[in-house]
Amino acid sequence: MSHNTFGHLFRVTTWGESHGPALGCVIDGCPPGLSLDAPFIQQFLDKRRPGTSRFVTQRQEADEVKILSGVFEDDRTDGPVTTGTPISLMIENTDQRSKDYREIRDRYRPGHADYAYDQKYGVRDYRGGGRSSARETAARVAAGAVARRVLGEDILLRGAVVQIGPHMIDPKNWDWAETQNNPFWCPDAKMAAQWETYLDSVRKSGSSTGAIVEVHASGVPAGWGAPVYGKLDAELAGAMMSINAAKGVEIGAGFAAASMSGEENADEMRAGNDAPRFLANNNGGVAGGISTGQDIVVRIAIKPTSSILNEVKSITRDGEEVDVRTIGRHDPCVGIRAVPVAEAMLACVLADAKLRHRGQTGH
């Protein structure tokens, strides 16, 4: 299996499976001299960690990260710092229940990667989905923490869930602080209460539901990205679509721009102090593939979890028609834990863009 690496200068390779002994990543291209230790990375892994509420999988994993290489400390450094060599990070799996999956080892879960993997490789790890499991995203979150060090403290990355099932937040109620007060990363306190009732019913019914995640990057300077085939928004879209269960991406106004007039969609400008003052951000912070200095805004549609308790029609590897239900511990809405993953992918793309911009322009 190839294509386990993304990025150009800031390159991340993830490895490992859902029910293997461990998973992790190798990061190449990180500049030397950046402060980096395990507790810094751990804070982001804890945001994604399973078993934190009844609305996510009850698999109990500490997700404790271990730094295996690329970081050094002695009496001449101010704490652990990156050396510029590959950074290897590892997270052990400790709560696998592979026996839960024996019933489906020869049966395909509709909507999952089972059938496609079998057709391509002729073999698949049915235990939790192997590489196709959302468990792989723990490594991405770890890499995203390193990317944040590359970006520095002037760039703020934040994410939220803005829709679960048919229930969408009211943008007028948006409060970033509220995302820390509920298990959904919801910026609308009123909608968070509705989601709790809705997801309880979904969970008890044995089904699952989808979500929309929105991530923002503030403080990105104008000029990152490149025209045509190196567009920053194209890099962002590709990174977000690589997330497990992602089925759609919007940047800025996204598909709503199709119903706007030219005047409505224009991000009109007025003179500011050191930079233009934009009157709108329908471009989502990117124009012509290059950052404008506005907030970068990306939304990701996350499909319902494919592994559900309710029976669905499928076939076996031999073509026999069967009904499939998945016994195990699964997220009723995997979109909730996709928030720190989307933040991490945003961080990695921007870190790569920063290094590429510096290499091309010298600043």
Swiss-Prot record:
Residues that hold FMN according to the record: 131-133, 244-245, 288, 303-307, 329
Enzyme Commission number: 4.2.3.5
Catalytic activity: 5-O-(1-carboxyvinyl)-3-phosphoshikimate = chorismate + phosphate
Job of this protein: This reaction introduces a second double bond into the aromatic ring system.
Keyword vocabulary terms for this entry: Amino-acid biosynthesis, Aromatic amino acid biosynthesis, FAD, Flavoprotein, FMN, Lyase, NADP
Annotated protein name in UniProt: Chorismate synthase
Cofactor(s) listed: FMNH2
Known partners and oligomeric status: Homotetramer.
Cofactor binding: number and manner: Reduced FMN (FMNH(2)).
A single GO cellular-component term on record: cytosol
Residues involved in NADP(+) binding: 48, 54
UniProt pathway annotation: Metabolic intermediate biosynthesis; chorismate biosynthesis; chorismate from D-erythrose 4-phosphate and phosphoenolpyruvate: step 7/7
Superkingdom to which the source organism belongs: Bacteria
Organism per entry: Hyphomonas neptunium (strain ATCC 15444)
Gene for this chain: aroC
The family this protein is said to belong to: Belongs to the chorismate synthase family.
Gene Ontology molecular functions: chorismate synthase activity; FMN binding
PANTHER family given in the database record: CHORISMATE SYNTHASE
Gene Ontology BP annotations: amino acid biosynthetic process; aromatic amino acid family biosynthetic process; chorismate biosynthetic process
